[in-house]
Amino acid sequence: MIITTWIVYILARKGVGLPFLPITSSDIDVVESEAVSVLHHWLKKTEEEASRGIKEKLSINHPSQGVREKMSTDSPPTHGQDIHVTRDVVKHHLSKSDLLANQSQEVLEERTRIQFIRWSHTRIFQVPSEMTEDIMRDRIEQVRRSISRLTDVSAQDFSMRPSSSDC
C-alpha cells in the first residue's frame, strides 16, 4: 500500500512536469555566527599580540624609536591613526564604575575566551585508510576473543549446573 502510494505520487509529479524531489534553494550560505565571531575575535587578539611583540623587539633593537612610539601612544590619537587596546590596558585605565557598566562585555569576552580554549583542545586527526583497516581488524579480533571467552564461560556454567533429572 505504501509503495503503491509513493509510485502514484512520483508518477503524478512527473505527469504534471514537476521533478520528484522538489527543487530547494541551495544558494543559502550557512554560517555559524558564534564560531565566526570567536575566530574573528581571537584573530584580532593574535594580531595585537604579534604587533606588540614586534614593537617590543623593535624597541630593544632601536631604543630611540621605541621611545617615540611610547610617546605617541600617550598622546591623544589623530585622525586615521590605528589604536590597539588590549583587555589588560582597559582594565588598568577604567574606573570601577566604568567596569560595572562594561561588565556584560567583559563576561562575553571571558565566555568567548573559554570557548576558544575548548575548541583549541579539540583535535581532529586524519588517519590513513591502511591504518583504519588495521585498527578495524584489531577491533574485530578483540570482539571475537571476548565473544569466544563469553561462550566458553557460559558453556562451563551450563555444564556445571545440575540438570532437572539430578534433582
From Swiss-Prot:
Entry-linked PANTHER family: SPERMATOGENESIS-ASSOCIATED PROTEIN 19, MITOCHONDRIAL
Lineage: Eukaryota, Metazoa, Chordata, Craniata, Vertebrata
Transit peptide interval: 1-24
Protein keywords: Cell projection, Cilium, Developmental protein, Differentiation, Flagellum, Membrane, Mitochondrion, Mitochondrion outer membrane, Phosphoprotein, Spermatogenesis, Transit peptide
This protein's name: Spermatogenesis-associated protein 19, mitochondrial
One of the record's GO cellular component terms: sperm flagellum
GO-annotated biological processes: cell differentiation; sperm mitochondrion organization; spermatogenesis
Leader sequence residues: none
Tissue: Expressed specifically in testis.
The keyword Ribonucleoprotein is annotated on this UniProt entry: no
Location in or out of the cell: Mitochondrion outer membrane; Mitochondrion; Cell projection, Cilium, Flagellum
Species of provenance: Homo sapiens (Human)
Function in brief: Essential for sperm motility and male fertility. Plays an important role in sperm motility by regulating the organization and function of the mitochondria and is also required for correct sperm midpiece assembly.
Principal location: mitochondrion
Keyword set includes Mitochondrion: yes
Residue positions where Phosphoserine is found in the record: S26, S129
InterPro entries: SPATA19
